[in-house]
Each structure stands twice: as C-alpha cells, then as structure tokens.
From Swiss-Prot:
It comes from Schizosaccharomyces pombe (strain 972 / ATCC 24843). This is Vacuolar protein sorting-associated protein 17. Disulfide bonds: none annotated. Residues 250-281 form a coiled coil. Residues 498-507 have a biased composition (Low complexity). Keywords: Coiled coil, Cytoplasm, Nucleus, Protein transport, Transport.
Length: 549
C-alpha cells in the first residue's frame, strides 16, 4: 500500500505536469523576488520571472496569467513562431489573442508626410471591433507613436521608423516600395511583441479616427541637461555582461555607419560632377567633329562624344543606385543603432534610480533604529519613520523588479537586433555589389561599341597601329574583350601569361574552341606578331605592349 501511495503521489506531482504548477494551484505565484540585485543575470527565462512588475512605473500586483506567458514565450522564441509569408502578412501561432496590421496603400500626394492606409484584424478583448479597414495614419504620426514606445518601454529595442523618402527622390514608385517594406516590418515588430501588444496607446493608434497624438507625452529621460549631466559620471555597475558589452559596440557602430554614409554621399556627389563633366566634354567633341575635314576622324570624334554622353547617363544612374542601396541602408542602420543606444541609456538611469533607492532605504532604516532605541522620542514620530521605511522598501522592490525585467528582455532582444542588422546589411551590400557589376558591364559595352570606329579612321587601322612599325590589317569585326587569352582593344595575344590562366598555349589558335574566337583563315583581323617566348623581352617590345590600344 505504501508503494501504491508513493506511485500515486509521484504521478500527481509537478514532475509529470511539465514542471509548472497549474493556474488553480497558483504555485508559481508564491515564488519570492529578491530585492537585492543579483551578481549575474541569467539569459534564459525561468518561472520566477512570471511575477514581475509593469514597466510603465505602475507595478501591477497581480501576476502574469498563464495564457499571457505562453503568448510571450511563443513570440520571443523564433523557432516556435511561424515565418512571415509575403511582404505584408504576419503568421500567428496558437489560438490566443493576436493583432495583425497590413499596409494596403500609401498616398504620396504630400511627399514629406505620406499617408499610410492599413487594414487591422485583432481578437484582443479591449478593442471595439475585430476588423478595421482603411485606417489612415501619416508618417509623422508613426514617428510620434515610436517616440512614445521608446520612452515608456525600456525593455524593448524599438526599431527606428524608416524615412518617408529615399536619398534620390520622393514620390516615385521605388520610394513607395522601400517605405512600404520598412513600415510593414516595423508594424510586424510592434504587433507581435507581447510587451507592446496590450499597451493602450497601440489601441488608440488603431482606433483613432483622425489626427492621432499620444495621450501621454513622455519625454526621453536621457535627453537635454540631464543627459549631459549623467555623461559626467561613470556608468553604474552592470551585473549583465552581455548588455555591458553591447552599448559600446552599438555606439561605435552608430558612429561608423553614420561616417560611412556621409563619405559615400560625398563620393556620389563627386561622381555626379564627373558625369556632368563627361557630358560637357562629349558635347564639345560632337561640335568639333562638324568642323573636322577628315571624314574618318570626324566620325570617330562624333562617336566618342556620344559615348561620353552615354557614359555620363550611366554614371548618374549608378550613383543614384549607390545612394538607394547602400547609403540609405547605412542611414537606417545608424538611426536604429542610435535608438538602441538611447534605450540602453534608459536602463542605466533605472539602475541609478535603484542605487539611490537602496541608499535612501538604508538611511530610513538607520533613522528608524535610532528612534526606536531612544526612549524620549514619541511613538507617533517612530510610527512615521517606520511608515517611511516601509514605503522606501516597497519602492526599492518595484525598481529592482523593473530592472530585472528590463535586463531579461533586453538580453533576448539584443540577439534579435544583432541578427537582423547583420542580415539587412549583408543584403544591402550584396545588392550594391550586383548593381555595381551591372553598371560597370554597361560602361564596358558602351566603350567597346566605338572600337570599330576608332580603328576605321583610315585604311591602315587608325589608332590601332600606334607604336608599331608595320601597318596592321583592317579590323572589321573585333571580338569582345571578355576573355582571358587576349585583350580585344589591342588584339594582342598574351602567350607569356597563358600558364597563369589555363594549361593551353594561347599563341596557337584552336578552331574548335567555343569561346567565340574565329579562324584566322575566315577572319583576317588577327595581327601578325612575332612569337614571344619565355626569353627576356627587349625594351622595344615592352614599349609596343604598353602603348598599344
């Protein structure tokens, strides 16, 4: 019988119930929270973290319900959350309350402050309706809401709101695509974060008819004179090493990203000035070709002028793409890093307030002990001192719970922030390199288009015979220059470098080669050059190689 009872007790224990007590048992609500700051903050959440206070100053005495805890775990765990499908959709896990916000259109009549139209679907009980269509908010209202969230939620790394226009222009289709993608990503974060989901300002942001403005105007505690004064003091001791190392890294990243953006903009401005100079030079050559008496040279000058104008157009488009792909990405990354730095500074202010509260509690405790030991002090005065001590202890406990809660959430969100920043910058750099390669190929194609006109200035090969004693044959159909065995601008084969590129000799022509080369008997464009072996080149041959076009 004793073994049967022990077996029943084991089956009814929390070992087989997942390690958590049920909601009716309320066992997890009785876990005490230590008022002293721990020596180290655990990165992984535990069941003791359920009974934490609110982060908005007013501490809720009731614990976090089990349903809210499950929603928070499902949202903060990337492996449990479903991946987003498409650009504007948000996948929700489970059957709990959710909030989905999807941008349907952007009205860019006012380029400085476009209007964003959204459809909202929710099952949260506090909302008046389950579906809101064509909710209109301006870009300035988005920034007001983001400023409120940054000030009142120090436990969340709120992303920065993307700018209303790119560095190139405003109101065009490409700008709207970038803005829609950035705002949708920002709304996805706000609507899926469990710490922001039940904020009353989020409900007001959705349900306001026109002209949204936050009801609580809270200024940034790390701005103005207080921020400058706090910079003069050393940072408070930080028990969380991850966040202690994160802030200097984010600050350095913010400065370097902003500096790289400024330098890239200067480079683009100079490239655009160079492109305009190319266009002016091309027009001058076109005007000069009209006065030229030699037909071949006049045609070549005209073609070179048009080529320079085409190069100018491509350079301007290339510089615009550089601003959109890389400069705007660096600008948003620096803005986002600045917001993260501000939020980490808000945490330092909370830690300073906690240290001040502990010192005040110790002073009240010393005063109460002195009053109790003195027989001449009235009982009313002693009661007042004890009451003040109790208030100080409650305030210290609330601040301690708030700092622990903020630290735990910031450790989680810092990992997500670093990962998203790395992925976004990798994507921007990849797109930047692809666009650069595309435009450089276009420039090479434009330059190669005038090769026949340069070589056909006269019947003897034009400029292609510079530096040679003998006249080369007329070039009519030169091969493209995208080869490793020759340079089509000079049509010279390079047997001396053949071993470094491939195993075959490039001085011997192979008619079965499929790289686009032509047979010498079919195309008389090959220049007759003396073979160059492995022996030392004489200065005259080197000069011919360097001066050839």
């Amino acid at each position: 019988m004793s073994s049967q009872h022990s077996t029943d007790d084991l089956m009814n224990s929390h070992v087989f119930s997942g390690g958590f007590s049920t909601l009716d048992d309320k066992g997890f609500q009785d876990v005490p929270i230590h008022t002293d700051m721990p020596g180290s903050i655990s990165v992984e959440p535990s069941s003791e973290d359920a009974n934490v206070g609110s982060v908005n100053g007013n501490i809720n005495e009731t614990p976090v319900f089990e349903a809210d805890r499950l929603i928070a775990e499902a949202t903060m765990n990337p492996s449990a959350a479903s991946s987003t499908t498409g650009e504007n959709s948000i996948s929700q896990t489970g059957s709990g309350p959710f909030l989905r916000i999807r941008i349907v259109d952007i009205e860019a009549e006012n380029s400085k402050d476009p209007v964003i139209k959204m459809n909202v679907q929710t099952t949260l009980p506090a909302y008046r309706s389950k579906l809101y269509k064509n909710v209109r908010r301006t870009h300035a209202e988005f920034k007001k809401f983001a400023k409120y969230l940054i000030s009142t939620h120090p436990e969340c790394l709120i992303p920065a709101v993307p700018e209303a226009k790119t560095s190139v222009s405003s109101g065009i289709k490409e700008d709207l695509i970038y803005l829609k993608s950035g705002l949708q990503s920002w709304l996805n974060y706000v609507s899926t974060n469990p710490n922001l989901l039940y904020d009353p300002e989020l409900q007001l942001f959705v349900e306001s008819d026109y002209g949204y403005s936050p009801l609580i105007n809270t200024g940034n505690p790390t701005s103005g004179l207080k921020r400058k004064a706090l910079k003069q003091f050393p940072l408070p001791p930080d028990p969380c090493q991850a966040l202690a190392n994160l802030r200097p890294i984010v600050k350095s990243f913010y400065k370097n990203a902003k500096d790289a953006e400024i330098k890239l903009e200067k480079l683009v401005n100079r490239k655009q000035s160079l492109a305009l100079t190319h266009a002016d030079l091309g027009q001058s050559l076109i005007d000069y070709s009209v006065e030229e008496q030699h037909n071949g040279l006049a045609n070549a000058l005209n073609r070179v002028g048009k080529m320079l104008q085409a190069i100018s157009d491509v350079r301007i488009m290339q510089s615009s793409k550089q601003l959109v792909t890389l400069a705007d990405s660096l600008c948003y990354a620096s803005d986002n890093a600045f917001v993260v730095k501000e939020i980490l500074s808000n945490r330092h202010i909370l830690m300073r307030d906690l240290i001040s509260s502990k010192n005040q509690t110790n002073s009240y405790l010393s005063a109460a002990n002195r009053l109790q030991d003195s027989p001449k002090i009235s009982k009313a005065r002693t009661d007042d001192a004890l009451q003040a001590l109790e208030v100080a202890r409650v305030h210290e406990k609330l601040l301690s719970d708030k700092v622990d809660f903020v630290t735990l959430n910031l450790v989680k969100e810092s990992k997500t922030y670093t990962k998203k920043t790395s992925v976004s910058l990798q994507k921007a750099i990849r797109e930047y390199v692809e666009k650069e390669a595309y435009y450089e190929r276009r420039l090479l194609s434009i330059m190669e288009s005038i090769r026949p006109h340069i070589r056909n200035i006269d019947p003897f090969g034009g400029l292609s015979r510079l530096g040679r004693e003998e006249y080369p044959r007329r070039l009519s159909n030169p091969p493209p220059s995208q080869k490793t065995n020759q340079d089509a601008w000079t049509n010279r084969k390079r047997p001396g470098y053949s071993s470094s590129f491939d195993g075959s000799s490039q001085s011997t022509f192979n008619p079965s080669n499929n790289d686009g080369a032509h047979n010498t008997s079919e195309n008389a464009d090959e220049l007759v050059e003396p073979p160059i072996g492995n022996e030392r080149l004489d200065p005259k041959s080197v000069a011919n190689l360097l001066n050839a076009i």
